[in-house]
Structures are given as C-alpha cells and as structure tokens.
C-alpha cells in the first residue's frame, strides 16, 4: 500500500509539473497574441461564473438542475470556441484561390511561350529559305563567271533580287509577341517571389501551433476543474473517478490530434513551397532562354540587313562582283547564327515542357486529401 501511495504521489507530482509548464507557456502566449487574449478572457469569465454557481452546491453537497444545466452550457460554449479557432485554421491549402490562380497563370504563360517558340521556328524556316536563295545566287554567279564578261550576270542579279525582296524572317508581329511573352515571364517571377515570401512567413509562424495547443490544453484544463467541482458537490467517489478518467483523455488524444493537424498544415505549406520553387526555376530558365534568343536574333538581323544591303548595291549599281564578295564574307556567320538560334529555340521549348512536367508531378505528389490550412 505504501509503495502504491508513493507511486501515485510521484505520478500526481509529474502531472502537476507538466500542467504548470503548459499553463506558463499558455500565459506567455497570451501576452503575445491578441486572439488568444480574447479567448482567455472569455474562458476565465465562463469558468469563474460556473465555479461560483457551483460553490453553493458544494456547501450543501447537492446540485440543482439549473446548476447542472449551466455547467453543461458552459462546457458546450468553451468547446465551440475551440472548434471556431481550429476551423479558422483548417481550410484546404490546395483549394487556396491565390495558389490556384498562380499555377493557372504559370501554365498559361508557358503555353504562350511555346507558341512563341513555334513562331520562332517559322522565322527560322524563312531564314533558311533566305540562305538557300543566297546559295542559288552564288551558284549562278559561279556559272555565269565561266562565260566571257559574265553575260551581264542577269541570273545572278535576278536571284539577288529574289533574296532582297524575300519576306523578313522576323517581322513586327514577331517582336511584339516576344515582348509580350518576356514581360509575362518577368511578371510571373515577381508573383512567385511574392507568394514564396508569404509562405516563408507562414512557415516561421510556429506560434500558431502554440496558440492552438494552448487553447486545447487550457479549455480541457478548465473542463477538468469544473467537473472536479461538480464531482465534489455530488460527493460521489465513483462519479468523481469516472469524471477524472473521462477528462484525462482529451489532454492526450486532443494533443495528438492537434499535432497531426499542425503537421498536415506544415506539410501542405511545404508542398506549396515546392510547387512555387519549381515554377520559379522553370520561369527563370525560360527568361534566360528568351534572353539568349533575343541576343541571337539581334545578331541574325544584323547579318541579314548587311546581306540585303549588299544585294541592293549589286542590283542597283550593277556591281555584282562587289556585292557577291560582301555576301560571301557574311554568309558563314549568318549560317552559324541560324543554327545557334535553332538550337536555342529547341532548348527553350524542351525546358518549358520539362518544367511543366515537373510542376504537375509536384502537384500530384501533394494531393488535396491532406487536411491542411492556410
């Protein structure tokens, strides 16, 4: 018996220390959180009122029906306050409108960038056609050079004129499209960074978890206190034991449940952040690809303009040899720029498709079935 009494005393002491620590933590949290202060004020008022009402019952070792009704009402109201706080934090993060619109914008922008890549490919085909026209002109020049005096280089001049009059590989609409796509990608980077900053702040706000756990603990603690008074008033040891057993359960199970809720919340936030990071990486790569494409197009435009001027000079001044010599000097660089631009266009297209696949995989990895909060 002595050992059992000592053992019970140690357990009671351990529980007392645990509760004291929790209450101190709760008191500290109240000072830093206005919502928790409001909850605490309401809880204290209800608990004090009920205990005062029960005081008379304790003195006469009896409780009126009205007193029991008031106790029940108080416990229900406290429970409702706890539920309200939890539900405020229990919205599904993957149904968050801002996140949904952000992902939607990303995929829409990526499709527009793929459309630009298709337009770029058409421009490259026109550039290759121009290259073929130049090769034909050079061949005609070689053939006509075999004849005395070149026979006026009529066919060479005709091919040079065809090259000069050919449609520009990259027209005004193409450059407008490029500017629009580039601007949208830069804006996307800003939106993603803004959202990422918000997620970082949420992940750092661990006090939300502390507030929830404190609310659960103190509400349960108040319930235990009130039920203890009820048991004392009824002076029924079996009832007191039953109440003690019943009220001890929430302290552990509710704590585990709320901890699970917090973990789901944190995991959902991290899942969102993973998707944001993937979209950031994809957008950043797309912007870099577009920058490289712009540089290569500018180089190609310079080479095309130079060759067109040489062709114009040859046609207008009947100076075929001078024009052809200038074109020959520029042709190799032109061909190289076309090839590099084609490679970059293909790379940009592949990068965008790869990024879209990665982001879809991230979203699938973090489905909606995890009850999460925003």
UniProtKB/Swiss-Prot annotation:
Membrane-topology descriptor: Multi-pass membrane protein
Any one Pfam family match given in the protein's UniProt record, by short name: DUF677
Compartment(s): Membrane
Predominant place of localization: membrane
A single GO cellular-component term on record: membrane
Sorted UniProt keywords: Membrane, Transmembrane, Transmembrane helix
Record field: transmembrane: 215-235, 238-258
Source organism, top-level taxon: Eukaryota
Family: Belongs to the UPF0496 family.
Identification of the protein by name: UPF0496 protein At4g34320
Taxonomic source organism: Arabidopsis thaliana (Mouse-ear cress)
């Amino acid at each position: 018996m002595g050992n059992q009494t000592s053992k019970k005393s140690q357990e009671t002491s351990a529980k007392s220390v645990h509760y004291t620590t929790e209450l101190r933590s709760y008191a500290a949290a109240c000072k830093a959180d206005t919502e928790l202060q409001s909850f605490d004020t309401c809880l204290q008022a209800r608990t004090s009122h009920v205990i005062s009402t029960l005081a008379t019952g304790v003195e006469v070792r009896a409780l009126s029906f009205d007193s029991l009704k008031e106790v029940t009402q108080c416990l229900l109201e406290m429970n409702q306050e706890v539920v309200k706080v939890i539900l405020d934090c229990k919205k599904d993060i993957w149904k968050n409108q801002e996140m949904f619109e952000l992902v939607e914008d990303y995929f829409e922008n990526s499709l527009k960038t793929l459309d630009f890549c298709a337009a770029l490919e058409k421009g490259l085909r026109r550039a290759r056609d121009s290259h073929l026209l130049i090769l034909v002109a050079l061949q005609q020049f070689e053939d006509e050079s075999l004849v005395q005096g070149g026979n006026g280089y009529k066919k060479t001049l005709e091919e040079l004129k065809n090259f000069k009059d050919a449609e520009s590989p990259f027209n005004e609409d193409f450059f407008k499209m490029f500017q629009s796509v580039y601007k949208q990608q830069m804006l996307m980077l800003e939106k993603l960074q803004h959202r990422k900053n918000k997620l970082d702040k949420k992940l750092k706000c661990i006090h939300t978890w502390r507030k929830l756990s404190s609310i659960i603990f103190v509400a349960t603690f108040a319930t235990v206190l009130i039920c203890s008074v009820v048991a004392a008033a009824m002076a029924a040891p079996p009832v007191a034991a039953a109440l003690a057993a019943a009220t001890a359960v929430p302290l552990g199970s509710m704590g585990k449940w709320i901890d699970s809720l917090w973990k789901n919340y944190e995991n959902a936030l991290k899942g969102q952040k993973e998707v944001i990071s993937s979209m950031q990486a994809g957008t950043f790569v797309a912007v870099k690809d577009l920058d490289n494409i712009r540089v290569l197009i500018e180089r190609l435009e310079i080479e095309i303009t130079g060759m067109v001027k040489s062709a114009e000079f040859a046609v207008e001044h009947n100076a075929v040899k001078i024009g052809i010599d200038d074109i020959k000097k520029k042709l190799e660089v032109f061909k190289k720029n076309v090839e590099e631009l084609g490679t970059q266009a293909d790379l940009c297209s592949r990068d965008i498709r790869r990024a879209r696949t990665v982001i879809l995989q991230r979203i699938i990895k973090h489905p909606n079935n995890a009850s999460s909060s925003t």
